[in-house]
Amino acid sequence: MKLAKIAVLAIALGSGSPSAFTTATRTAAVTIDYPEDGSIFPPEITPPTFLWRDSSASATSWRIDISFADGSAPIHALSKGERLRIGSIDPDCVADTNKPPALTPEEAAGHAWKPDPAMWAAIKKHSVNAAATVTISSGPRSRGSVRIRTSRDPVGAPIFYRDVPLMPSELERGVIKPLAESAVPLVAWRLRNLAEPRSHVVMRNLPVCANCHSFSADGKTMGMDLDGLENNRGLYFLANVKPEMSIANRDLIQWSTAKGVLKGSARIGFMSQVSPDGRFVVTTIDPLQAAGKSDSSNYYVANFKDYRFLQVFYPTRGILSWYSKAAGVLQPLPGADDPRFVQMGAVWSPDGKYLVFARAEAKDANPPGRPMAQFANDPNELPVKYDLYRIPFRDGKGGDPEPIEGASQDGMSNSFPRISPDGRWIVFVKARNGLLMRPDSQLYIVPATGGKARRMRSNTRLMNSWHSFSPNGRWLVFSSKARSPYTQMYLTHIDENGNDSPAILIENSTAANRAVNLPEFVNIPPDGLRSIGGPALEYFRWVNRAVYLQKHNRLAESIAMWRRALDLKPDDALAQRNLGMDLLMTGHRAEAGAHLQRAAELKLSAAVADHPEDAQTHEALGRMLLEHGKPDQALPNLHKAAELDPQSAAAHCDLGAALLALGRLDESLAELRKALALDARFAPAYYNLGLVLSRQGEADEAVRQWRKAIEINPQYKEVHDSLGSAFYARGNAAEALSHWRQGTSSPAALRQMAWLLATWPDQSLRNGQEAIALAVRASQLSDRNDPAVWDTLAAAYAEAGRFADAVLAAKRALALAERQNRPDLVTAIQSRIRLYEGNKPFRVSWNSGASRADRAPR
């Protein structure tokens, strides 16, 4: 066979960390550090990089001999022993808060060689039945050997994982924020086929953190926890896996609005897991009695400036809940919903019949007086030691949790269980405190029914966690910081007896200054997942851009971004509110008001969904919709409020107001009389009753009802507006003006006052300057698009002797009236323009039969 080509090593190694090298063949002058003796490789993996050190300083070349126990001819190669080099660096991930990876002196003294693909294929072929021996020598007495083997068991599936920068955020007690805000869009998600030398990106540039992910056993369903906007950590997507996945809004779940008894309590969804059949999701949420509390009361969080271990994070309160994909219902799991404990990190058995989860005594995450931890495993960390428990699922009925022998009550913290696909084994993380990313975390394996737990051979010297079984159960992928503070991905083989092999590095998983975490095997073909995108994820990108532009006062651009976000998600309160605020700041008052109103409606609609049996919430939403001119939408909520609380005068009054707005006067009258029967001093009922009577032509009786309302509440502005209009209709201008001055100062009320002050026949009541001021204010409030307001302003200018201004204002009113197809107003304005052009003001000719256009423009 031809000599192997010499490969230049491009692999991330530690920065100032102790050597990760092993002690294989210590008596020899050549020490082979990787792979370790006894390593097992999957049949499809690409060539590994062999690493060794030679005590002979004069050695300049090495002979590599691979011999086989199956009788095949040995393979020989020569290597110049290239020095180790750091892999490629992502410049976007270089920051003041981290350091580039660097070699220790020991690592810098090492050498590297990688067999070419043809040679590696031959090595794998002849090392299946028995181990191959790899000997590296620089002379007759300088040699070292390791035995390696190729498994018959393929990995059989690609690995989905998260690829993150290590750019710590500022320390903020109790806030879950491991990365600086600017670093979050740098997070990527990759898929790695071990038969290929590199991975490919399937999702990137999300402005929110997407983290714990899981797949159904057949690889057809994917779920992922999302940190939504405004620190919303209760978002989740559940979607069908396709080569090009498009996440739609229908695929998003907000735990706090999912149907079921847990409404409003699910502030955070944590370590959610899709069931093997894809029908259910189990997640950890806040305990019911903690609903509305801050996140910091349920999670111990410490963020550090040390990029190597930049966060300590674990729940101190929580219950397990399960979600039905078919029903859209979120329910607590009986037996794992005890508020005395924190119950979290549940995983499914392969048949979906039971769950294994971590449990500890519940406690306050931030007790008063406790110092904040400054580093991982700081003695000041809140002590929490989890035990593993098993509980039946029984279609959501749960049962009695039972501790798992070997993974509980051992003085250590046992967490992150993963059950083998054959149901025989549980691999979990054991550490002194907390869970997951601990410097001392080690992988242990225990029978699924409980028993003696064994420390796995594949453990590296520093942090072992985030593990996942291959679909055939013969391989385990996990993450470690053994070679670098920038976490890397490793592989170990597990046989039928639960014995595992030394760790195999999955090389070239990302740049040398980025970290790999949350690796998970996915039961799909190598090209079964090429991209994840879609409108739901694009929405986050537009919103993130809009927020950036908003912060930098680039409001015209941010408005465009908010509009794009709303194109993707029209019923989003956040985007509606922010668009409304930006429009308001740029002077578009009317459009701003519409968006702000919609945002408020959406917020209350969410509250109704959370509390469907709460009469006050239904009433609040119904009243808001009614105020926004949507009585048809308000009616169902107001009916429900009156049904839930039949003794509420307010509920019957609001229902009566909605029926009035819909023209159902008799029904409205009945509801208002019910309200007054319940509370004879309920002023709003008298107000609405007056409106009904006025619509029925009983003007005098309407005034009597409004006077009763004023007797109860002299400051009732809407009643003053109605009384003003009633007295104006009677020709009592002084009384009308008195009430309007005490009214709402709405555009309509301001316009009517201005019209009276500008046009009334009695000179003692006219005041041109005040009329101008009131009309200008009405125009501002109506976004300058109401022809009646411009008509009123023209009359006010004429009363003040400003006839040229009167003509201009009247012509603006005429143009608007023509555009809005208001022929009666057009005719009236045309006649008034002729007066102003002749330097004459307009005077109403008031009598009971005068046309409405002569009394006051509408």
Positions of predicted regions on the chain:
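Terminal, low-structured helical/coil segments at or just beyond the last alpha-helical repeat
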Residues: 515-532, 539, 593, 762-766, ...
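Structural signature of tandem alpha-helical TPR/SEL1-like repeats
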Residues: 553-564, 585-603, 616, 627-640, ...
